[in-house]
């Protein structure tokens, strides 16, 4: 079982609503555990595959998949060309638009898709205080370690880090630090 699935299995009891960047096995697991899931996916083929799989009665109505068109993508959903930059900027916000529309309160955010730094910063500012943010592959990707400038890791599961949204962290995320993160909104890693 992957680190991500293990972490979700441990932490899912604390929420009934999850924001997810990058859909897959975790989407299915969360739905089967009874969570409402707002999931965003960059690969059209994968989006079709996951939504087809989620048509069953167990998950119907609980999972809201959003296709984020960021242009042509590779097999992992990463853009192969940087010309649709406006779409890159919308990607981190798309699930939060749905959250606000549906008046939901997510207590868990799962980052396993594209633009993880941008999605982390967006989620850190949008999620309620006390919410947990899981970021897959955190330790093996040193670019992600910028997060440590304002957020404190609360748990580690293999290569996955868990962070809690705190007021102190939000206060540390000042203008200068936000500017250092601004390029992450255009970087699909």
Each predicted region: which residue ranges?
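General structural signal for secondary-structure boundaries
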Residues: 1-5, 9-10, 166-174
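SAM cofactor-binding core of SAM-dependent methyltransferases
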Residues: 2-75, 141
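A generic local structural motif
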Residues: 3-7, 24-26, 93-99, 120-122, ...
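Generic structural signal of hydrophobic/aromatic residues within well-ordered alpha-helices
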Residues: 8, 50, 92, 147, ...
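Short aromatic-enriched loop/helix-cap "lid" or pocket-rim segments at secondary-structure transitions
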Residues: 51, 76-80, 147
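Internal catalytic-core helix/loop-beta-alpha segment
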Residues: 66-122
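C-terminal substrate-binding/active-site "lid" region of AdoMet-derived donor-dependent transferases
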Residues: 98-189
